């Protein structure tokens, strides 16, 4: 089959080489965007008098037929035609004849593919943004139901201080809010039209780039044609934002995996988000959380791969840029699916509130409360820290906790300690009193929830 660019070539291509160079197996995902870009381009060609209105009408009608066939799944693509652009042009030629050749006037595949990618990513990021917004709603709802659910707060995966489970959830709400802000802010760099940049230097035809951009819903055009066809920053930025988002999902999934274990039993995932074992009949594994954790590395790999492809590329287009699509497509699909799965897990998981709170009563996470108590009585904090540290050591040697120490012994340690110490040492009191701004105190959490709701 003749190549659409075959004029200067004499030798015939070989199928196995065609297959290696072809991208149609994956860039056909952008067929809808390619057709939209062509419709805008032909409308602009007609408006500017570059092709007759009658020919523009023929081309437009042909493109709309292809749109209908695409929607019905009736378009067939071939590796002989390399990519989505040449496949569409070939199919258009079959529909309307030689006039189809005028569609590519004042256009290169270089600005064509860039336009397709901008259009595709803009729509896909909008969908991810909606899923991320839904996740934030789920987190707020779950936090609202668990303001007074007490759990251990950790540092170094060791019990540190008791906190509200809602406080823990709202910490992730903050992370996902930043993810949302990054994605929303990045849209303005995706929402730019490269169409009309042609191969790299613009065109001699009197085109109207602003008009085609407007038809496609872009808010701006690239000011430099060379930049327009060479820029893949918008993809790298998306991959970077996605990597940070996946990292946040992965951190939470790691905690869910721990919390569902027999050693913790803080939460229970529903059967829908769990799997069993082929040999051990008792198993209920948090596979979906593990998969999200695993797929995070996959998204990182797509980012590193894209950075490496671009690292040594001179301007403008190079065939290396064919490698910019699969990682983008894969990341879009991975992030979208992971967000939906994760939101479902959080929304439906059961919180074992009693086990959570009990775990704060069999530890020394209330040690800071005793140190603060002494400091409020006038003991220098460093001295109070030393006193409590020695008492914790004594307790561990005797197999008891701070709340088990007799008042008489407390008063031997420091006569300033009174019987109110036992209220101070309770987990609920420890949490309730931490009402500094942004703290885990119940009043602060209620303020945080109200603030969070305003951003939903």
UniProtKB/Swiss-Prot annotation:
<dbReference type="InterPro" id="IPR008948">
    <property type="entry name" value="L-Aspartase-like"/>
</dbReference>
<keyword id="KW-0055">Arginine biosynthesis</keyword>
<dbReference type="Pfam" id="PF00206">
    <property type="entry name" value="Lyase_1"/>
</dbReference>
<dbReference type="InterPro" id="IPR029419">
    <property type="entry name" value="Arg_succ_lyase_C"/>
</dbReference>
<dbReference type="InterPro" id="IPR022761">
    <property type="entry name" value="Fumarate_lyase_N"/>
</dbReference>
<comment type="pathway">
    <text>Amino-acid biosynthesis; L-arginine biosynthesis; L-arginine from L-ornithine and carbamoyl phosphate: step 3/3.</text>
</comment>
<dbReference type="InterPro" id="IPR009049">
    <property type="entry name" value="Argininosuccinate_lyase"/>
</dbReference>
<protein>
    <recommendedName>
        <fullName>Argininosuccinate lyase</fullName>
        <ecNumber>4.3.2.1</ecNumber>
    </recommendedName>
</protein>
<keyword id="KW-0456">Lyase</keyword>
<dbReference type="GO" id="GO:0004056">
    <property type="term" value="F:argininosuccinate lyase activity"/>
</dbReference>
<comment type="similarity">
    <text>Belongs to the lyase 1 family. Argininosuccinate lyase subfamily.</text>
</comment>
<dbReference type="InterPro" id="IPR000362">
    <property type="entry name" value="Fumarate_lyase_fam"/>
</dbReference>
<dbReference type="GO" id="GO:0042450">
    <property type="term" value="P:arginine biosynthetic process via ornithine"/>
</dbReference>
<dbReference type="GO" id="GO:0005829">
    <property type="term" value="C:cytosol"/>
</dbReference>
<dbReference type="InterPro" id="IPR024083">
    <property type="entry name" value="Fumarase/histidase_N"/>
</dbReference>
<keyword id="KW-0963">Cytoplasm</keyword>
<dbReference type="Pfam" id="PF14698">
    <property type="entry name" value="ASL_C2"/>
</dbReference>
<dbReference type="InterPro" id="IPR020557">
    <property type="entry name" value="Fumarate_lyase_CS"/>
</dbReference>
<dbReference type="GO" id="GO:0006526">
    <property type="term" value="P:L-arginine biosynthetic process"/>
</dbReference>
<keyword id="KW-0028">Amino-acid biosynthesis</keyword>
């Amino acid at each position: 089959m003749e190549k659409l660019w075959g004029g200067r070539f004499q030798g015939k291509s070989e199928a196995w080489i065609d297959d290696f160079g072809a991208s149609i197996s994956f860039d056909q995902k952008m067929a809808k965007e390619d057709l939209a870009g062509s419709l805008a381009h032909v409308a602009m060609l007609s408006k500017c008098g570059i092709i007759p209105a009658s020919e523009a009408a023929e081309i437009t009608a042909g493109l709309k037929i292809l749109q209908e066939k695409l929607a019905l799944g009736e378009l067939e693509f071939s590796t002989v035609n390399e990519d989505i652009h040449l496949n569409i042009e070939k199919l258009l030629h079959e529909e309307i004849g030689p006039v189809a050749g005028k569609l590519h006037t004042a256009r290169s595949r270089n600005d064509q593919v860039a336009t397709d990618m901008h259009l595709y990513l803009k729509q896909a990021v909008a969908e991810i943004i909606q899923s991320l917004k839904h996740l934030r709603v789920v987190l707020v709802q779950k936090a609202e139901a668990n303001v007074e659910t007490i759990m251990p707060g950790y540092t170094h995966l060791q019990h540190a201080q008791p906190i509200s489970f809602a406080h823990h959830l709202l910490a992730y709400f903050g992370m996902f809010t930043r993810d949302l802000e990054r994605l929303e802010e990045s849209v303005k760099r995706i929402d730019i039209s490269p169409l009309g940049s042609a191969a790299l230097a613009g065109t001699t035809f009197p085109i109207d780039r602003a008009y085609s951009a407007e038809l496609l819903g872009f808010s701006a055009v690239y000011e430099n044609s060379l930049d327009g066809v060479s820029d893949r920053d918008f993809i790298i930025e998306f991959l970077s934002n996605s990597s940070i988002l996946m990292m946040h999902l992965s951190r939470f999934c790691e905690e869910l995996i721990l919390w569902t274990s027999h050693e913790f039993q803080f939460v229970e995932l529903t059967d829908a988000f769990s799997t069993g074992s082929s040999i051990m009949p008792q198993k209920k594994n948090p596979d979906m959380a593990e998969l999200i954790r695993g797929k995070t590395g996959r998204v990182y790999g797509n980012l590193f791969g894209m950075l490496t492809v671009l690292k040594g590329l001179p301007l403008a287009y190079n065939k290396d840029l064919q490698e910019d699509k699969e990682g983008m497509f894969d990341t879009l699909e991975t992030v979208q699916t992971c967000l939906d799965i994760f939101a479902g897990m959080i929304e439906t998981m059961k919180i074992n509130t009693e086990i959570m709170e009990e775990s704060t009563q069999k530890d020394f996470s209330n040690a800071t409360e005793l140190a603060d108590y002494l400091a409020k009585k006038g003991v220098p904090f460093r001295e109070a820290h030393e006193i409590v540290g020695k008492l914790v050591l004594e307790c561990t040697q005797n197999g008891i906790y701070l709340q088990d120490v007799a008042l008489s012994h407390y008063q031997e340690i420091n006569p300033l300690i009174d019987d109110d110490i036992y209220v101070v040492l309770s987990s609920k009191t420890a949490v309730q009193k931490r009402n500094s701004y942004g703290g885990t105190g119940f009043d602060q959490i209620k303020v945080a929830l109200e603030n969070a709701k305003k951003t939903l």
